[in-house]
């Protein structure tokens, strides 16, 4: 599970909500 609350700008990539 990927937390939708993750700020992808902090990580440098887009995190989509996947199960």
UniProtKB/Swiss-Prot annotation:
- Respond yes or no to whether keyword Transferase is given for this record: no
Example GO CC term: the record gives: lysosome
Q: Where in the cell is it found?
A: Lysosome
What is this protein's function per UniProt?
Answer: Thiol protease.
Q: Which residues form a coiled coil?
A: none
| Broad class of the protein's primary localization | other
Q: Which molecular function terms from Gene Ontology are attached?
A: cysteine-type endopeptidase activity
What is the protein name given in its UniProt record?
Putative cathepsin L3
Catalyzes what? Specificity close to that of papain. As compared to cathepsin B, cathepsin L exhibits higher activity toward protein substrates, but has little activity on Z-Arg-Arg-NHMec, and no peptidyl-dipeptidase activity
Organism, as annotated: Fasciola hepatica
In which domain of life is the source organism classified? Eukaryota
For this chain, the family text in UniProt reads: Belongs to the peptidase C1 family.
Instruction: Tell me a GO biological process for this protein.
Output: proteolysis
């Amino acid at each position: 599970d990927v937390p939708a609350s993750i700020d992808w700008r902090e990580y440098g990539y887009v995190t989509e909500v996947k199960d």
